[in-house]
A protein has these predicted regions:
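Structural beta-strand/beta-sheet cores of well-ordered domains, especially the beta-sheet scaffolds
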Residues: 1, 28-30, 210-212
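Entry/capping segment at the start of metal-dependent catalytic domains
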Residues: 1-25
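Extended, well-ordered alpha-helical scaffold/bundle regions in very large, multi-domain proteins
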Residues: 196-216
Length: 216
């Protein structure tokens, strides 16, 4: 699974939790493949919704979800689903505000466990994939995912109506990321990560989800 999002927060400065909790945060695109099948893209920003089976799979602990740097997908999808479907969450403590990490696996961690590279782009080049991450992605993310000041002084996000052709390319970029991830996963599957490493990862994620109490 791979997503595209927008927020007024700079994720490099504040991290994914503050980024996703912003009132301006929005989920734009979701691309996914089920059991190595064809890639589907949901244009959330333009009224499409996740199919019920996909939404249910996100909360089903028996269904393994994979992404490259999965913490981003898990937290952002948690916030999106929590706002639209609060009944899906158990708010007994802060960890209940997020999708349970035990059914999520991170391809970046898998790569690093094998002593390989930690970016999707670098892994595509390393494995000499014919179709790699699209180079236009950074410019498209700047255009659609960050705030812009217009000539009249207003500050807003660009959307499909501002550049329809760019939006279609943005969707293709999102879809391509999943296609590249699937090819990388086929290679990684020959060298599985031991279960104890995933257990350590789940503990790490729970620690981050719980956070710390701070007097203000």
């Amino acid at each position: 699974i791979d997503i595209e999002t927008a927020s007024d927060e700079n994720i490099k400065d504040c991290g994914v939790y503050r980024y996703a909790e912003s009132e301006c945060f929005d989920l734009l695109l979701v691309s996914y493949a089920v059991d190595n099948g064809p890639v589907a893209t949901c244009d959330i920003a333009n009224g499409e919704t996740l199919p019920d089976d996909v939404r249910n799979a996100l909360t089903d602990k028996t269904v393994i979800k994979k992404a490259f740097h999965v913490n981003f997908e898990r937290i952002c999808l948690s916030v999106y689903l929590r706002r639209k479907y609060p009944e899906m969450f158990d708010f007994k403590d802060s960890t209940g505000s997020y999708l349970d990490p035990v059914s999520w696996q991170c391809d970046m961690i898998h790569c690093r466990y094998l002593g390989m590279l930690s970016s999707l782009d670098d892994m595509g080049r390393l494995l000499r994939l014919k179709e790699k991450k699209m180079a236009e992605g950074k410019e498209l993310i700047r255009f659609f995912c960050t705030l812009h000041q217009e000539a009249d002084g207003s500050i807003l996000f660009h959307d499909k109506s501002d550049a329809p052709k760019k939006w279609e390319k943005f969707k293709a970029y999102n879809r391509r990321d999943v296609e590249v991830e699937l090819k990388i996963q086929r290679y990684l599957s020959e060298f599985p990560v031991p279960e104890f490493v995933w257990e350590e990862f789940y503990i790490d994620q729970e620690i981050n989800d719980r956070g710390i109490l701070v007097d203000t």
